[in-house]
Curated annotation (Swiss-Prot):
The modification N6-acetyllysine is found at residues 10, 15, 19, 24, 28, 37, 57, 65. Its main location: nucleus. Residues 1-42 are annotated as: Disordered. Phosphorylated by IPL1 to form H3S10ph. H3S10ph promotes subsequent H3K14ac formation and is required for transcriptional activation through TBP recruitment to the promoters. It comes from Candida albicans (strain SC5314 / ATCC MYA-2876). Keywords: Acetylation, Chromosome, DNA-binding, Methylation, Nucleosome core, Nucleus, Phosphoprotein. This is Histone H3.3. One of its GO terms (cellular component) is nucleus.
Length: 136
């Protein structure tokens, strides 16, 4: 017989609810106005973990193409005006930039974990870059 996954369900039977104090009952019944339902919220970190799994599976570029292209052209203006770029050149630049950033964030996360934290900070990124030899 195959095993099936058990899901949590609300119980219908069981013990009868205990009587509450008058002040507790008044507090609970007072704010009910029109039965407005709160929107569903996930626990902190749940959505972040889901996004991490989704982006680790994907292979598409994460930075939008046109804003990246404008940034490349703006930076290139400082070196030489009227430069032209093939679309494949900008695509190659974007691939390289995203690969670099992903690697940097991985190293930054390792620095934060080493410091017994789960949140990356500016000093983690500075340490990661210094260990890579990019910055003195």
């Amino acid at each position: 017989m195959a095993r099936t996954k058990q899901t949590a369900r609300k119980s219908t039977g069981g013990k009868a609810p205990r009587k509450q104090l008058a002040s507790k009952a008044a507090r609970k019944s007072a704010p009910v106005s029109g039965g407005v339902k709160k929107p569903h919220r996930y626990k902190p970190g749940t959505v972040a973990l889901r996004e991490i799994r989704r982006f680790q599976k994907s292979t598409e570029l994460l930075i939008r193409k046109l804003p990246f292209q404008r940034l490349v052209r703006e930076i290139a203006q400082d070196f030489k005006s009227d430069l032209r770029f093939q679309s494949s050149a900008i695509g190659a630049l974007q691939e390289a930039v995203e690969a670099y950033l992903v690697g940097l964030f991985e190293d930054t996360n390792l620095c934060a974990i080493h410091a017994k934290r789960v949140t990356i900070q500016k000093k983690d990124m500075q340490l990661a870059r210094r260990l890579r030899g990019e910055r003195s």
